[in-house]
Each structure stands twice: as C-alpha cells, then as structure tokens.
Amino acid sequence: MAAAPSELLPLPPPATPGSYRLLSRCRPYAPGTDGRRSGGTMRGEKNYYCRGAAGDHGSCPATPSPLASTLLLPAEAVSTSWSGPGSGLSGGDEEETRLLQLLRTAPDPSEAFQALQAALPRRGGRLGFPRRKEALYRALGRVLVEGGSEEKRLCLQLLSDVLRGQGEAGQLEEAFSLALLPQLVVSLREDNPALRKDALQILHICLRRSSGQVLRTLIQGLESPDARLRASTALLLPILFTPEDLLQGLDLTEVIISLARKLGDQEMEEESETAFSSLQQIGERLGQERFHSYISRLPSALRRHYNRRLESQYGSQVPYYLELEASGFSEDAAPCVVNLSSSNLKFEIIPQELHARLLDQEDYKNRTQAVEELKQLLGKFNPSSTPHASLVGFISLLYNLLDDSNFKVVHGTLQVLHLLVIRLGEQVQQFLGPVIAASVKVLADNKLVIKQEYMKIFLKLMKEVGPQRVLSLLLENLKHKHSRVREEVVNICICSLLTYPSEDFDLPKLSFDLAPALVDSKRRVRQAALEAFAVLASSMGSGKTNVLFKAVDTVELQDNGDGVMNAVQARLARKTLPRLTEQGFVEYAILMPSSAQGRSSHLAHGADTDWLMSGNRTQSAHCYCGDHTRDSMQLYGSYSPTICTRRVLSAGKGKNKLPWENEQPGVMGENQTSNSKDIKDTEQFSAHDLIPSPKLKPSQGMPASDDLCFSKKRSSRNLFQSSRDFNSESVPTCGAGNTADLQTNLPGKCGQLGLSQIGCRTGSVGSDLQFLGTANGHQDKVYASIDFGSKTQQTFGSQSERTSSYSGSNASPGSFILPSYPLASPRTSPKHTSPLSVAPKKSQDNSISFSNSWPLKSFEGLSKPSPQKKLANQKSSDPTGENFQEKTTAVQLTPALVRSPSSRRGLNGTKPVPPIPRGINLLPDKADLSTMGHMKKQPDDIWKSEKDNLTIDLSELNFRDKDLDQEEMHSSLRSLRNSAAKKRAKLSGSSSTSDVDSPDSAMKLELTIDSPSRASSPNISSYSESGVYSQESLTSSLSTTPQGKRIMSDIFPTFGSKPCSTRLSSAKKTSHAAEQSPSAGFTRSSNLQQISSFDFTSTNTLSEDSVVIVGKGVFGNPNSAPTTCSQPVISSVESEDTFPVKPSIEPPSGVYGRAVQHNAPLYPEVENDKDTKVSIAKSTYEKMRQKRKEEKELLDAKDCERKETNPWERIKHLGSEKMTSENEPSSGVIPQYKERMSSVTHSPEIMDSLELRPFSKPDIALTEALRLLADEDWEKKMEGLNFVRCLAAFHSDLLNTKLHETTFAVVQEVKNLRSGVSRAAVVCLGDLFTYLKKSMDQELDSAVRALLHKAGESNTFIREDVDKALKAMVNNVTPARAVTSLINGGQSHLHIAVRRCTAQHLADVVECMDPERISSGTKDMADRLLPAAAKFAQDSSQETRYYGRKMLFLMMGHPNFEKLLEKYIPSKDLPYIKESVKNLRLKGLGEIPLDTASAKGRRSHPGSVGNTRSSSVSRDAFSSSEREVTEVREVPRKSAPRNSLESAEYIKVITGLLNAKDFRDRINGIKQLLSDTENNQELVVGNIVKIFDAFKSRLHDSNSKVNLVALETMHKMIPLLRDNLSPIINMLIPAIVDNNLNSKNPGIYAAATNVVHALSQHVDNYLLLQPFCTKAQFLNGKAKQDMTEKLADIVTELYQRKPHATEQKVLVVLWHLLGNMTHSGSLPGAGGNIRTATAKLSKALFTQMGQNLLNQAASQPPHIKKSLEELLDVTVLSEL
C-alpha cells in the first residue's frame, strides 16, 4: 500500500507540559510491529504518533468492549442486517454473490479481500458491485467491527486503495458514509497502531471529500459513551487536521464546542487534559485570528472553563497563538465573530448553540439561563443590519417560547420582546402584526409581572406607531375563545383611550369594533366594554355620541342584545370614568356587582348592573371551570394566584331584602327609596360576618390586590378544621370582607378555620346553613326564615351586612352563609373540596336570619319591631339609624375584589332593563365613616365574655306580636300580587319562560343549558329528608318530588373546638315541585307549599355545638303556630311518614324542614319534648327508606378496617378529645362519605417501580393482597395490586407458592371497567413477567389473552402499558410458550389492533429465537409459527402485514425454508406467501408502513387504535432501569416538525377558522389550510383527522361560495397529501359526493367531479373501493350514475391487484343495480337513467372476470342474469 503523504503526520511541535504527559503514556511500543506493511518512512512517523494515539494501556483495557452504543451503527445492527440485503442478490453474478457470502459468514474472509483487491486494477480502481454496493459496504463495516486484526488490516487496505482509485474529487457515496465512517472512527481506538494509522489515513482522505459528514462522525466519537474512543478521537484530531490548507475550508465550530465541553468535567481529568491539548494544537494550526473567532463563539460557561484551564496551565506565559485575556474574553470579540461567520447565527441574531438551549425541553434551567443570555445579547442588537425575514423568524421564535410551561421563560421572553420593540424603534411598524400576535398569547395570564410586561410592550408600540394601528390589530382578538383575552383587549383599549388624545383614534370605528363585547357571554368582558364605552363617550364629547349609540343599536338588533342600549345609557348616566393606576392598569369606576352588592344600597341599582348580572349567553355556572383565573379581581391587572371559580349569591335589598334590613330598632334611614324593579332572578340568603364574600371590595385601608381565596392545597389539608380562637381584632377584620387580612390577623391562621376556598366551596342554599352565629343562651334570640327559593346561587354575606354586625349593641354578628349550588369543575369536585366550618362570633346580640327570596314577614328583633317592616319594597336601614348599609358600601374608587361570577343569570331579553334611577347618593358621607370607626373600636370584653358559651337560646322563636307578623305578611303578599311583575307572570302561565321579575321567580329553579341540575352540591353529602346521610353526585338530577310538595333538610356543621366532620346536605334532596320546560328548564310551581315554623322553647338540653333552626313558611295560610321541642338532634326515618328526633345520634346540627300540603294542618303533631314527628310525602319516604336500607346493608358488609380508615374517624382524632361516641356518624353515613371523600384523603395510584419496598412479613402481605384483590372497593384493588408488585419484586419465591391464584386475580382486574384499576393490573402483570420470568410459563395463556384484548382499548396509556407488559413477557418467559400463548390469544381476534399487537410481539419472539431452531423442523414451532406468519402477512392492516412479513423474513434464511412453507402453509395461501418471500429476497423487509400520518397524530385519536402501534413509552409506569428490560423498540417514523403545544395551537386556530360563523372567515380558513398543506405538510399530516373533521363540513357548506372554494381546494390538496388521506377517506368521500354530485350549480358539480377524479388518480384505489361501492349503491340521481361509472374505472385498475376483494365488494353493487333496474333503465326512487353506467360496470367486470362473471350471475335470480346478458355486448359473448 502506497505511503501516505508525509504532511499527514508532521513532526510534533514543542510539546506543552500537558501534551508531554499525554504522549508519554504510550511510549511502550515496538517499532517492528508494522513490518508487514509497506512504506518505511510512514511507519517511522506512524510509530511516533500512534504511540500517542494508542493511549494509556493501563487505563484503556486491551480487550475491546462491545460497541453497541459507541456510534451510529452498533455491531448488532450490522450483523443482524445481513440476512436481508444479502438475500437480495440476483443470480446473475455468481462471483459477486460468493464474495459477499464469504464476507458475511466465513470465519476467515481473507480470500474475499484478496479477490476484491485483485479485481481493482481490472475495474479501474473501483469495487464494482453496481447494484450491491451498499451491501458490500455494510459487509466491510461488519468486518471492521467484528473481524480479527488481520481481517481489519486487509479491510482498511482495500478501502484505502478504493478511495485513492476514485480520486479526491466529488463527494463520498452516501452508502459509504453511513456504513463505514462510524466504524472507521471506532477503529481509532484500536490497540494496534497500524490499524489506527490506516483508519486515520482513510478518514483524512474522506475529510477532503466530504468534510461535513466526517466532522459529524468525529463529534460523535468525541461524545461517545466509550471513554477509550473519546480519548483516542480527541488525541488524533489535530493530526487529522493537517496540512494547514485543509483547515481553510473546514468549519470547526462544533468540534471546538465538543472539545470545550470536556474542559469542565472534573470527574474525568485525563479526558479534560486531552481535550485541552487538542485545542492547543488546533489553535496553533488555525492561527491566532481564526482560533480567537472560534473560542469567542463558545457559550460563556465553556469560555470560562477554557480561560481557567489556560490560566492554570500557563499562568502568564501564554503562547502567541493562544493569547487571550486570562480572565475572560473582551466583550468586543463577539461582533467580529458575526462578521467572520454569520452561518453560526440563527436568524443572524443568536448563536446556534443558544438557540438549541432555548428549545431544550428536557431542562428548564437550561432554558431560563438561555433566555437571560438572550436578553443580554439583545442589548447589543443592531436591527438595521438584520434582514426582515430574519427578524420575522426571530419573533416567531419568541412566539413559540411564550408557550413555555416555565414562568421564568415566559417572563424573560416578554422582556426580550420588549427589548426588541425598543431596539426596532420606528421600524417596528413592519413587524407590528407578529409582535402583537405574540403578545396576545399571554393576555390570559393573570400574573402581575406578566401584565406589567405586556402593558409595556403595547404602550411602546402605541408610542412608536400610534394607538389606532395597534388597537386595530388587537381588536381582531375580540372573538378569542378565552374570555380573559377578550377582557384584556378591551382593557388595553381603555388604557390607550385614557393615555392618548382623542385625535389619535378613529372613535367611530373603535365604537363599532368594541360593541360586540357588550353582549359577550362573560360578565367581566361586558363590564369592561361598558367602561370602554364610558371612556369613548367622554372622548367624543357631548352631542357627538350618535355614532356610539348607533354601534350599540347595531349590536342590540343583530346579536339579540335586548337591553344593552339601556345598560349603556345607564352607565353613561353615572358620570364616572375608569382611571389608570400607577402601574398602568385600568381601575373601573363601577364595581362589578355581585349578587350581594347588586342588591345592597351602596350602589345604585340600574340597567347597567342588571345587564352585568344577567345573562342568557353562557352555558352555565360551570362554564368558568376551565377559566378560573378569570374573575380574580375587580381591578384589571391585579394578581391572584388562587382563584375561586364559583359564583356566589348573597342577600340583597328591595323585595328580597333580609329581615334584619328593616327590623332593626332605632331610626330608619331617610333614603329608603322603593324600587320594586330591583328583584331579578337572584335568591337572597344571609351571610356570616366571619366569611368574606368573594365579590366584596376590601375593607377600608386594605390593599385591593389582596387575595380572597385560599389555595386548594390548603383547603384540602384543612378540610374539617374549626376554630374558636377569634379575638376582637380578627373578627371585625374578617367581617370587613378581606380574606387576605383575615389570613394575617387570625391567630392560628385561617387554615385552622377550615375556610376551604372561601366563598367557593359550599353547598346548596336550601340545605346548607353552614355558618351559624351564636349568642347568649338565655338572653339573646335567634331568628331564622328559611329560604325556599331556587337553589341556584351560592352566597356569602355582603359587606354591608357584615359591617352592620359590629356597629353597636344591636348589631347582629351571627349572620349566616347559605351556600347555593355546586361548581361542576373537577377542581372543585368532591375530590378537592370540603364543607366550610367556622367558629361563631359572640356579641351582646345575635340576630341570626335566613332570608326568604319571597317578600315575607320579618321576624321580631331584639326590641319592638319597627313599623317600617311592613314596607316590603323599602331598602333596609342600618342598625344605627343612619342608613348605614347604603352609605358604608357606596361606590369606592378602590376596585372591588371579585370572585368568579359563574353563569350569567337572566338576560332573557324579554323586556327592557330600566335605566339607573337618578338622585341616589353614591358616595359615603362623614356620618358613615364615623359609624365605621365606632364599629372598629368595640371592646374586646364583649366577645371574650361569651367565648365559651355556644348554646343558642331558641326559646323566643315564638313571636310575641303574631298579629303584627300576620299583618305584615298579608301586606307583603298584597304588594306582590299587585305588582306588574305578578301580572306578567299570570299572563305567561305555568308553561311560559321564567320571568325574572315575577315574584314566583324566587321559587324557580334556574337550570343551565348543559347541566341537568344546578342544585346539587358536589362538595357535601347530605342527611336526606329521612336523616339518612347520603351521597350526591356532582351532576345529580332533581328528585322527583310530587308537585305541590317540597322536602327540605339542612345540616349545620358543628361548632366549637370539635372539628367539623360534616358534609352538608345536597340540594338534590331539596328539589322543587316544578315542571320541566324545553325553553326555560323549569317553570314556576303552580302549587306552593307552606313550611311551618318550630319554636324551641327550651335550650337546656342543647349541646354545646348544636343548633337547630326550622324555617317558617310564607305561602298558603299565614296562620302558623309555633311548636316546641327540646332536642336539637337529627331525625331519621322510623315508620310511616314521621321523623322522630332521636338523641342517640348527634350529627352536625342543622336546619330540618318538612313539606306540608297547601291545605295541611298548620300545627305539627307534638308528642313530647323529645319526640317530634314531621309528616312527609309517602313517595319520598319510600325512597328514603329504601336508600337507608341499602346503605345499612352496605355498612354491615364493611369490616372493622373500613371503620379505622374512615375519614370521620380520622377527623375525630385530629380534632379534639371531646368527641364522644354520640358524635359518630349514623349507619348511613360511613359508606357514602367514604366514597365522597376518598379522593380527598387518599387517591390510590400506581406505584413507581422505585417506590416498591419489601415486606417484613411477606406471607401475611400475600394473604392480604389476595383479600384486597377480592374486595369490591376499587381503591383496595389498587392497593392489592401494588402489594403483588412488591411481592414479585422482593419475595418471588413466596409468590410462586400461590402464583396461580395471584395471577388469576390480577388477570380478572385487567378486565376491570375502571381504567385506573385495569392499568394497574396491566403494570402488575408486566412486573410478574419481569421478576418471575419462566415461572410465569404456566400462567401465560390467560394473562396474554387478557393483555392482548386490552390492546384494543381507546385509552393510549392502557395500550402503552400493554405494550410494555407484553415486551416484558417476550423477554423473560420461554419463547415456545410465548409463541403459543400469543397465537392462541390474538391471531384470530376481530379487532385490528389486537391482531397488530399480536403480530408485533410474535415477531419480537421470533427475532429473539434462533432461526435455525424455528425452521429446523420442530413441529411445535414451525407448525404454529408459519401459518400464523402467513395469516398475518395477508391481514387487512398494513402494520400487521409488515410484522407477518418480518417473521417470514427472519425465518427464510434456512435452506429448507421453501419446503417448510409447502409443508405447513395451506395451499390456498401458498402462492401469495411465496410471492411475498420472493419480494423480501429482492427488496428486503423495508420500514414499517406509517399510512396514518405521524405517530403523534395517530396517538391523539382514540378512534385510530386499529391503525397504529401505540407508543411504548410509558407515563412513569416503569423506572428508567426497567425500561431497559421492558421497553418496546420504537417504530421509525418522521419527526414531528412542531411540538405538541404548537400543534394543538395550530389545530385550534385552523378549526376555529373552518367552523367560523362568518363565511369569509371560513374561506380564509380553507385558503390557510391549502397554504399549510403546500408549505408545512408535516404539520397538516400529523393532525389530519382533527383538521379534516372540521374541513369536511365545508365540502357541503350551506354557502355556495364556501362550498365551491372547499372543493377546489380539496382538488389541489389531493396530489399533495396522496395516501396520507387514508385515515380520513371514509369521512371525506361522503362529504364530497353526497350533495355535490347532485348539485344544480354547475360549478360545484364540476368541482366535485374533479375531486373524485383526483382521488382515483392519486390515492390507492383499494382504499376507495368500499366507499365508492357504498355510494354507488345508495345514492340517487346523477350522483349514482357518476359513482357507478367511477367504480367501473376502479375495477379496471384494481382487479389485477385485488381480485378477491374487488369481486366481493363490486358484485354486490352490480346485483343491486341489475335487480332493481326497470326496462327503461331507471331505478325506483333513484331518478335518472342508470343503464349506461350499469352497462359500463358490467363490461369492466366481464373484461376482468370473463366467464366467471356469468357463472356467478347464474346463482342470482333469473332476471338479474338476463339483464346482465343484455347489457354485455353480443360480440363479446360470441367470442366465448
């Protein structure tokens, strides 16, 4: 072999200390070892250098380690790939075939090398093998990996000669690069220096021809897991980069970076020194300037490592070529780098390495650091030198980074965007659209710093390009799906209007653009729009608002916005404007009116507040569940980390005002204006002064941004805690309505109060009287009127109600909370929420009132009732006589803290909303402020003196002045009956839509569109009417209580030091007598009932924490009489229709009501003080009795362990030792409560493998595991499965003793309908296979069958775990048993996914086995495997066929394979299988077909389970160590161009456009889809099912323009997508042909015809066969003719490929046509003449089938055969 050029290996430069150490390690080398090679000079040079190349033999073992993970092609891959391509040789060239066979299989391939070497001169220095060159290169690569020293030498010599013969011109062949470059780099670590030298020489030649490929391979060597290879590659790199002229054309950026990465590795100091030595030598060869440019491009961290190494190595004596600042590089180095090599800059702005770190999804710290570096980089950015396209790309990068899940990345990206806007200056107008689009992505974020950043961006944009241009683009997002984005858009408009002069805006256009927000479905957006219109009107000036009202008129007429004009006029009448805060946020002038504030007297109630409070445009209160960052603050921009997502409803004023609002003694206020219009469809409830309303403004002096809600974690942790530790300071603070202050002022923190998501997590109004104030048991009185209105709203007391509690001696701090309805959000479901409990407040006076939404007689107060109580429509006065409520809660400039309104109520649009009344004082006066100050100064002793006295004196619930009460009741009822609302209600009748102003609205149950009931309570279970504790579902429907009757049962939580462990009763048990209406949900009840009142005269027997309040009815005969009882205990069903009050069971105290018929006796039956019986409806009683019976049976079935783990028992121990057996739940409580609370206290999950631990007593654990698996409770099943996994991992010997019983139990759970249990069982089986290995052989049949059947599940995580379990089975059990169980379990299954999974894992078994063993004639194996492989190879699924062919491919290397095929494969399948084997020999196996887009796209659709192999990457089900054992090899597939977040965002955008209401938007969406298909096909293909699910509707759009554009677009997309359309072909064809082929529009018909033709031309006709047959059979008219003719065309093309399928499907259509066609050629009912098309189809079939067609027609009815013969040409028949 000729000597290499002498310059390849120059003499070493004066070695540095580091390099001397490196070279000295490998001095022991015998120069004579290369004597057999030519080139003595090179030997000498080689001997010197390769001593260094060899490395330290002491540190590098002589025996080569396996190369499985070193470079691109592992040895296994090389060796196992030879059975394929080798067999692809044709028989034409026997010599080449023989040589390849020698290279593959011969133990000594030297003969082949000599033959190839000898043939080189004849072939001009070329190898030959024109068709098998790739196979030859791979064979040579195999020799380099597995051959001996001599074989490797011959191979390297041959490669060297071949490369020299080819010359130095041209690129390397791709086959050579893929097969040999990795193995050549691996050869650099050879112990033999001669081999290293030869490999280095070849790489040098390759480097001149294809530098990029060689450098990439070298970098892989530098980063290989093999330490010897890394060291050898780093040491030989400088030698490879000689001479210097070679370096001029190389880009060594990545090489320098790879070497620099090793400098900071302290653990491998030797590698670090080697890398530094290589950098030194490369720097000497490159020269100072170029080396500086490379080093300065390093990331700052790597530069620091290099500098430190430089300092430690040389100190101040740095060589000239390495002269750099020892402390770091100068900052001026970076700009010159950009000039030197801009190719290293992404978007010509940021380095490639920084770009890669920005997109690193593995390490968030890497991304955050990269964003910080990007900010620094952008500080020096000069936009004038950057092209427009690069800046757009950079903004696109920032757009994508704003989707990051890490807050710091998003925040930093916004700062970068702001810096970019600043740098661009006036040039930003060219990029205005992309910048705004990026900024809009974060508008939904409620974090304060995020708001500040994007406000800076928008204000800077407005400054540079003007506000109107910015708003024009921004307002395009006013239809955004996220309500917060819509609101923020309006708020930014308000901010700009308040910042810039009106001349800078197009105010009329702005008015029309903002007008749709007035009728938005979300209350907060409507409020923002009202505020914006107030600013617009101010900007326009007086007399110029006609345009404004015209815009409102347009919306009112077009968008069903009845009442919006009145709302705008009312808002303008307030003469107040929003303002900007110091932070630049908008502060509304008008508070968001909660139902509490909207009815209180501090804010004038008008049409604008009514408009905000009402709403018929949202689905329900539950619609906010997914948007619970929405309504956090009234102040736009305030930050709230925990958002309550429940709408609350509190007591208001007007007709529905609470009793204490007008029964307080003293002087009544002067401004008691009557306003009967104030009543809407809101129910009024009382409030507890300890719990702040979620919609109340903060108290005086409290910051507006304080948070009102506790986090969910805290609420879960403090579910049932209660506290009495209130002092005089904390109580008023809580009463002021600011929970943030309550959090800081309460001793022991608010978490001890059990305030779980304050204001957000309570139950139904009529049944949940949760918070009860208590007072002196002997002197103070507690009055309550139960609200029997609709249980649709939840409330906490308004601020006015609470502040009145401390105003003086007559204050009533004992106000209650009457929660109303549940939230259907999963976050607030029973798994996450808890009932509220709070300790009572003490005062001299406790007036505890529960208001009725119907105007009713107020109970008597502490002193003589005021005559003003009779005025039912008057506003209430404050307890001090100074109109306290109205004034202290007047409009403040400080914004209110608002907590999630839910569904808007009303907005029926049936009548105009009255404008705001004039003449109402909106601001507080000095008297109010002084009153509030007095209230805050109450002495502590008032509260402390009552601290331990929690009993409530109910003895005076019997009212003294019955005449006055009755008179007031009659007055109220008369007032209501005479009202206009009552008249309208009568006119509408019982079937009319609910009238929000009618008095009956208080009794209506308001239902939403998507919820069967809003009266159920998700976070509370109930004692039902019978007293039986029962669980209520989140979406439970209303009880079918007989009309005219109503049952009510309300439970109080316990108070005092004992923890409250109660769930409050659900409103399901408090159902209304109502009739369902399609339009209104429920109409008013026609037969109202009367609720009698109880008067408890004795309180001596009341327990310390028990309160019973019984409601007083208001309908029917007002002559109610009191009745007494002394035991405040729960009642339960005992017999007949009565409720005996039983003292033995003492659940949490509550309110117990009863249903009384309209004409029932007014006085309940009283037997004695301890036994009060209340009548109920018999039907209800029967239900309750049955339920109680079932619950008791369930309880009896539970063992003692259940009681020990009972949440009630745990609560008992957590609370206080004072809990006695009397407080234990009744028999009906435990099972339901356990079910409701199990997810709160403990949610069983699948344990990670790393969490498995051994048992101290495994035998007991095994018995317990079997018992748990047999339990009916799914949670216990999960626990049992985890037990089994632990036993398998650590006690396998013990488990083997009961393996059959255990496996049987686990297999049964695999079939469990609960997906969590099923998945856990699948994981458990995988562990059993992994740890027990061949011990599982006897259990394989049942286990594998169950697993295979689960492979057809739609849940991706189930399929993933099944894949893992089966892979574990394949790897660990006996292969023969695995084959048998797989074939038995899934070969003949009907589900396509089961068969695919079976074939996949069967192929894995075959791959693991020796083909010789399979094909050796062993009957058990060959007899089962070959027929199975043949069947799978003919399956309908492409993937299944692939695995079938793979099994054949793996077995066909046996010389007797053909005989085995003939022996074991049925004769009918044999020709097809032989053809398949022949193709495999010629073409190889190929890759697995992916005909259904990317794997990601398929996995996202459960329906595609039959067409895809599920990903084998489990979600934390297995540890990383186990994945090495159980992971299924990934199917090769194209990488998705975008991440999942981008893909999801794209789908939302494109489907939103395609489904838009405006036809122009739909057309734009269609055009956008075409553009994306042309420019970004991978994205479309990856989500093709979701996209075309929206697009298919456009193919038959009602708008002909859209229809035509869609068809024309489809015609253009078909050639682009081709077979990628296969997943959607069945839904696409009906959309194309059903209406369009019968269209009278010639354009649409022609377009549809073109689409069908394009489908036939570009899509596999086999996919079209069945849909075309269906349409030809069932369509009518012209469409039937066209589809029949098109079917004939398909037959001509397809029959040769798929004769059987074509006959099977097409003949059915032909017999249908012939059998129904009349003599005239038409079909009955089909229209049109079908004879021509039928004749064409018949001739096409006859051409392909010949006489066989007539033979098959003979089996049909005679007229069909006759018709067929008539249609066929006579000349054709005569030829037969």
Swiss-Prot record:
Entry keyword Cytoplasm: yes
TOG 2 as annotated region, ranges: 351-595
The record's note on its domains: The TOG regions are composed of HEAT-type repeats that assemble into a solenoid structure. They mediate interaction with microtubules.
Region feature TOG 4, mapped onto this chain: 1540-1776
PANTHER family attached to this UniProt entry: CLASP (PTHR21567), TOG ARRAY REGULATOR OF AXONEMAL MICROTUBULES PROTEIN 1 (PTHR21567:SF6)
Gene: Togaram1
Residue ranges, compositional bias (Basic and acidic residues): 1521-1533
Alphabetical UniProt keywords: Cell projection, Cilium biogenesis/degradation, Cytoplasm, Cytoskeleton, Repeat
Primary role: Involved in ciliogenesis. It is required for appropriate acetylation and polyglutamylation of ciliary microtubules, and regulation of cilium length. Interacts with microtubules and promotes microtubule polymerization via its HEAT repeat domains, especially those in TOG region 2 and 4.
Effect annotated for changing W1274E: Abolishes association with microtubules
GO cellular component: ciliary basal body; cilium; cytoplasm
Short name of one Pfam family: CEP104-like_TOG
Region entry TOG 3, spans: 1259-1481
Biased composition (Polar residues): 826-836, 845-855, 871-892
Region: Disordered, residue numbers: 655-676, 817-921, 970-1000, 1062-1084, 1493-1536
Major localisation: other
Effect ascribed to mutating R367W: Resulty in increased tubulin polymerization in vitro
A GO BP annotation: axoneme assembly
Protein name: TOG array regulator of axonemal microtubules protein 1
UniProt KW Cytoplasm keyword: yes
Family per similarity comment: Belongs to the Crescerin family.
Gene3D superfamilies, alphabetized: Leucine-rich Repeat Variant
Subcellular location: Cell projection, Cilium; Cytoplasm, Cytoskeleton; Cytoplasm, Cytoskeleton, Cilium axoneme
Residue ranges, compositional bias (Low complexity): 988-1000, 1509-1520
HEAT repeats: 175-212, 214-246, 250-288, 344-383, 389-426, 430-465, 466-503, 505-542, 1297-1334, 1338-1375, 1541-1578, 1582-1619, 1623-1661
